[in-house]
Regions:
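Bilobed "Venus flytrap"/periplasmic-binding protein-like clamshell domains
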Residues: 39-48, 58-75, 111, 128-183, ...
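Periplasmic-binding protein-like
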Residues: 44, 127-138, 202, 210-249, ...
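A ligand-binding cleft/hinge motif common to bilobed small-molecule-binding domains
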Residues: 93, 107-118, 163-170, 188-192, ...
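Acidic, polar ligand-binding/catalytic clefts
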Residues: 79-146, 286-297
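A structural signal for short loop-to-beta-strand junctions that line the ligand-binding cleft
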Residues: 29, 109, 117-126, 220-222, ...
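Extended ligand-binding regions for polar small-molecule ligands
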Residues: 64-72, 145, 150-151, 156-158, ...
Length: 303
């Protein structure tokens, strides 16, 4: 016969587990309802995905999608208004800020990979990125093999850091890595001649080139170094909020909104300088819309 102490311990453990699960399942939605607000993590220089337009205003492809998502959730919660607080994040602090509750939903340029998925959750992907190389047009650099002995910039805290080292080992090409604190800083390293190349997501490269003083002075070259799903990030222990986000994403896709959003942010003049990024819709991104999923980058790069 089971002792009273064991029965009591089991009951307490069960109650605690139920309480934790209930709290975890509804934490973000309850916070939104009780406070009337939500905190969105945004980037400052990830044009056209997530960036500042000045005066503490933020916009971009992922930012607009997140506003649509939050609007849908607001309506489902029966709220008349929902205040969105914007919290700038960096490549270094974005994951910790989601983990500790400072940021409720991160709408930037974060790659969904298995390492990060141990700490945070990812919504279904609406943008599939290709990592490329940006150089000065007159550099003579055409591929990663031409980077031998060169200085190559990338942004601290991004997957491109590990990617560079992987390609360096695999191809026997030795180059010096230099790091920018954010994407604008990394591009400045290339612009000022302190780096010979900048390796990063193609959209970020194209956005920074379009935003530069002389866009014709730069070009994107070489092979695709990696294919990466860029996804909206949420807390790992809040499956109910992730489900609400994914339900809103499914509605946006079903209502045919995605092609218009792509044209607006990648193929049309965008604020504040009316630059045109000029990045065509890729088959991989189009497929992600047609087959919504939260697969990590490792699944995209299987040989």
């Amino acid at each position: 016969m089971m002792s009273k102490s064991l029965i009591k311990a089991g009951l307490i453990a069960g109650l605690l587990m139920g309480a934790v699960q209930a709290q975890a399942a509804s934490a973000t939605l309850d916070k939104m309802k009780s406070s009337g607000a939500v905190t969105m993590g945004v980037r400052e220089s990830s044009i056209p995905m997530s960036y500042t337009t000045g005066d503490s205003r933020f916009d971009g492809y992922h930012v607009e999608i997140c506003r649509m998502i939050l609007g849908d959730i607001k309506d489902k919660l029966g709220m008349s208004t929902l205040r969105i607080n914007y919290q700038p994040v960096t490549s270094q602090n974005r994951v910790p800020l989601v983990q500790n509750g400072t940021v409720d939903i991160e709408c930037g340029t974060t790659t969904n990979n298995t390492a990060r998925a141990k700490d945070v959750g990812f919504a279904n992907t609406l943008y599939v990125e290709e990592v490329r190389i940006a150089v000065k047009a007159n550099s003579g650099i055409k591929s990663i093999s031409d980077l031998a002995g060169k200085k190559v910039a990338t942004t601290t805290g991004t997957t491109s850091v590990q990617l560079l080292r992987k390609h360096e080992r695999a191809n026997g090409v030795n180059f010096d890595e230099v790091f920018g604190k954010d994407h604008a800083d990394s591009f400045l390293l290339l612009e000022s001649g302190r780096a010979d190349a900048f390796v990063m997501d193609g959209s970020i490269l194209a956005g920074n080139i379009a935003n530069s003083k002389n866009p014709k002075d730069y070009k994107i070259v070489g092979e695709v170094l990696s294919t990466e799903p860029i996804a909206i990030m949420v807390r790992k222990d809040d499956p109910e909020f992730k489900a609400a986000v994914n339900a809103a994403i499914a509605k946006i896709v079903a209502n045919g909104k995605m092609p218009g959003l792509w044209n607006k942010w990648f193929l049309s003049p965008i604020p504040p300088k009316n630059i045109v990024v000029g990045l065509e819709l890729s088959p991989a991104t189009k497929n992600a819309w047609a087959n919504l999923n939260d697969k990590p980058a490792e699944d995209y790069n299987k040989k």
